[in-house]
Amino acid sequence: MSILRINDMAPNFDANTTHGKISFHDWLSESWGILFSHPKDFTPVCTTELGYMAKIEKEFTKRNCKIIGLSVDPLDDHEKWSLDIEETQGSKVNYPMISDEDLSVAKLYNMLPSEEVNDGNRTAMTNATVRSIFLIDPNKKIRMMLTYPMTTGRNFDEILRVLDSIQLTSKNKVATPANWKKNDDVIIAPAVSDEEAKDLFGEFRKIKPYLRYTKIDSND
């Protein structure tokens, strides 16, 4: 099994989803994308996760980012469970969910825990994906990967924050500091000289030669 790393090309695949059959790269088109797996339908933590993602999906849409979920459950379960999510979490799931019953995508993206992935005889009936998230850019490159244990629900506001950071730093010679949020000051890249920094950003605060802050409109 290949090991995926940041800046690798996101593997393409065909899959059955609640929105019909897709080819992943074609579905992404020119958008950013979030591919995230959950262990099992009709489970409590997953219900809260998918409900919250449904609630904030519009924020990803504003940023030209599509969302797609995945588990090894059949499509019928996805569709029935979506009704429970809407009932209990107050948000309708409008993004597609992949039914990966043969584990092909889970294995392609290393979404299975080690005690399960090492047994070639395991099936969807005995496997459950961990809580993995992949952020993919319009060039189909993996820009961020996160994996949580099954017992810990994810912070999807953090995923949105990372998307904001990566979109901003992809267009500007900057990085974002610890706990950065959209429209906070950013750090000028060390490779940028003071002279170039003045040309690019105008005013900036110099704490150390390697630590310089400036402000950039995150909506640019």
Report each predicted region and the residues it spans.
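Chalcogenol-based redox active-site neighborhoods
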Residues: 1-220
